[in-house]
């Protein structure tokens, strides 16, 4: 649900839109959970949710009917939490074909977005993710990239590499915090409520181990993702 909450915060505070819409797949827990979280957070942020549409699954190929309703409702911003294989070739082009030219935003499922040949369709498309090599706000990022390239024949690290890297150092921090005679239980207790500063952002883990963290926003320009901003979690 966290990506949906962050998207609502971004729409309200950064883009400063007033009318938003959401489209999600009811048969997919990821899509529906994030989509509903966005709608709830948007209302709390004072945004008007002019349309809340859904599809029977998260891998349909036809969304024109729902998108026509969203366009007719006057939405300035559409949150569509689907995967790269659906949002890229179907939802975004179909939204443009019904006359919707506003913002489209998604979660990290947009990483590696499959696009059609007409890259202009993807202007005003954004998504949240964990990591960007262009993030100048985090000094750890460039050090990580240099070290990774040196150890891996100049290969570029991706989001999952960065997440794995942070996981190792987060565990090391927890073990150190647990002390010299660390046990499984003491390490688990050390992780609970622990704050961590990593390549993928700064975050705090709650008692269940779920992170409340900063999130990267990328914007597509000429079909290529570019760093837009970093959103810090609400206190």
Regions found by a protein language model. Name each.
Residues 1-54, 77, 171:
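An alpha-beta-alpha
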Residues 34-130:
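Extracellular/periplasmic bilobed ligand-binding domains
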Residues 24-25, 82, 148:
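Short glycine-centered, acidic/aromatic-flanked micro-motifs in structured strand/loop junctions
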Residues 92-165, 219-221, 225-234:
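Extracellular/periplasmic periplasmic-binding protein-like sensory domains
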Residues 53-56, 203, 231-233:
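Generic detection of short hydrophobic beta-strand segments and adjacent strand-loop junctions
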Residues 12-17, 39-47, 68-75, 93-100, ...:
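Sec-exported extracytoplasmic/periplasmic mature domains
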Residues 1-19, 32-34, 60-63, 88, ...:
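Hydrophobic alpha-helical segments within soluble ligand-binding/sensing domains
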Residues 150-162, 172-225:
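Segments of small-molecule ligand-sensing domains
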């Amino acid at each position: 649900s966290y990506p949906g909450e962050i998207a609502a915060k971004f729409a309200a505070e950064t883009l400063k839109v007033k009318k938003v819409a959401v489209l999600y797949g009811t048969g997919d827990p990821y899509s529906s959970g994030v989509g509903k979280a966005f709608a709830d957070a948007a209302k709390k942020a004072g945004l008007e949710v002019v349309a809340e549409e859904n599809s029977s699954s998260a891998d349909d190929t036809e969304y024109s009917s729902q998108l026509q309703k969203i366009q007719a409702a006057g939405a300035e911003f559409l949150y569509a939490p689907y995967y790269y294989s659906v949002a890229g070739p179907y939802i975004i082009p179909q939204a443009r074909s019904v006359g919707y030219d506003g913002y489209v935003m998604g979660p990290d499922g947009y990483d590696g977005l499959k696009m059609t040949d007409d890259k202009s369709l993807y202007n005003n498309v954004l998504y949240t993710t964990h990591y960007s090599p262009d993030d100048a706000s985090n000094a750890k990022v460039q050090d990580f990239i240099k070290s990774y390239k040196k150890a891996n024949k100049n290969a570029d690290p991706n989001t999952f590499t960065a997440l794995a890297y942070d996981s190792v150092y987060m565990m090391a921090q927890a073990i150190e915090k647990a002390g010299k005679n660390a046990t499984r239980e003491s390490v688990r207790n050390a992780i609970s409520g622990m704050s961590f500063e990593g390549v993928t952002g700064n975050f705090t883990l709650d008692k269940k181990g779920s992170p409340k963290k900063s999130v990267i926003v990328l914007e597509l320009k000429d079909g290529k993702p570019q760093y837009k901003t970093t959103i810090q979690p609400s206190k």
